[in-house]
A protein has these predicted regions:
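N-terminal cap/leader regions of alpha/beta-hydrolase-fold enzymes
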Residues: 1-232
Length: 232
C-alpha cells in the first residue's frame, strides 16, 4: 500500500519516510506516525497502512536514517543518540509541513513508546500540528512546556508499564490540566507496548512488553474517533 518518499525539514535537510495513502481520496486528512525505539520497521509501516485504510494519509519519518533493530541494547543506543529536540522541531515539523503542502488541510501526530514521547514534544514545538495521540511514552516533564500546547491530545497508557511508570502519566496529566490543555487520557490494565501485535509469547523482544488485542482494539477505535473529530 505504501511507498518511500523524501521530504524537506525546515532547515533544508532531507528525510526519507514511508507514506501510505487511501485510494482515490485527494486532500484526505493526514497523520504523522512516529516509530518505537526499534526504528522504521514492518510493524510501524503496518500502523500507517491501517491509518490509510481508515481514510488518512500516513507518513512515518525515518528518524534513525535507515537503521532498525530487534536488539534492545542496540535500540537503546539508537534512541539515546537521537536528538529529540531536532527530531520534533525538524523531522516531525517537516513531516507535518510536507503533508499540509501536498493536500492535507489538517495533520495529526501519533507515536508509540519513544514515539509517544516525541508526540508530546511535538505538541510543544510544532504549532502546525492539529491533534496528537500519545501511546505509552512521555519525555522528561521539564521539557514539556504545556503552556505552548494548542492542539488537543489523547493519551493511551498502560497501568503496569515498566519503561514509562504510570506515576509519570499522573504528573503529565496534572501539568496539562494546569495549563488548560484540551486532552483526554485513558489508562489500561496492560503492560508496555500493548498495541504492538508482534510482542506476544516467544516473539517478545523484552519481558516487560505484552500485546493485548482487546485493549489494542479499544484504543485504536478511540484514536480513529478522536482524529475523526479533530482532523475532519
Amino acid at each position: 500500500m505504501g511507498k518511500t518518499v523524501t521530504y524537506q525539514r525546515p532547515d533544508g535537510g532531507s528525510v526519507n519516510a514511508y507514506l501510505a495513502e487511501p485510494a482515490g481520496t485527494a486532500g484526505a486528512p493526514a497523520v504523522v506516525v512516529i516509530q518505537e525505539w526499534w526504528g522504521l520497521n514492518d510493524q510501524i509501516r503496518g500502523v500507517a497502512d491501517r491509518f490509510a485504510q481508515a481514510g488518512y494519509r500516513a507518513l512515518v519519518p525515518d528518524l534513525y536514517r535507515g537503521r532498525s533493530t530487534l536488539d534492545a541494547e542496540e535500540a537503546h543506543h539508537l534512541m539515546t543518540n537521537l536528538n529529540f529536540g531536532d527530531a520534533a522541531g525538524q523531522d516531525i515539523a517537516g513531516a507535518v509541513a510536507h503533508l499540509k503542502g501536498s493536500g492535507s488541510a489538517k495533520v495529526g501526530v501519533t507515536g508509540f513508546c519513544m514515539g509517544g514521547a516525541l508526540t508530546t514534544l511535538s505538541a510543544v514545538h510544532v504549532p502546525a500540528m492539529d491533534a496528537g495521540v500519545i501511546w505509552y511514552g512521555y519525555p522528561p516533564l521539564e521539557y514539556v512546556d504545556a503552556g505552548r500546547i494548542k492542539a488537543p491530545l489523547m493519551g493511551h497508557w498502560a497501568i503496569h508499564d515498566a519503561p514509562f511508570p504510570i506515576a509519570g502519566v499522573d504528573a503529565l496529566e496534572a501539568k496539562l490540566k494546569a495549563a488548560g490543555v484540551k486532552f483526554e487520557f485513558f489508562r489500561y490494565d496492560a503492560q508496555h507496548a500493548f498495541f504492538n501485535e508482534t510482542q506476544v509469547g516467544e516473539k517478545k523482544l523484552l519481558p516487560v512488553l505484552e500485546y493485548n488485542p482487546a485493549l489494542a482494539a479499544q484504543a485504536w477505535q478511540r484514536t480513529v474517533e478522536f482524529f475523526g473529530r479533530t482532523l475532519r
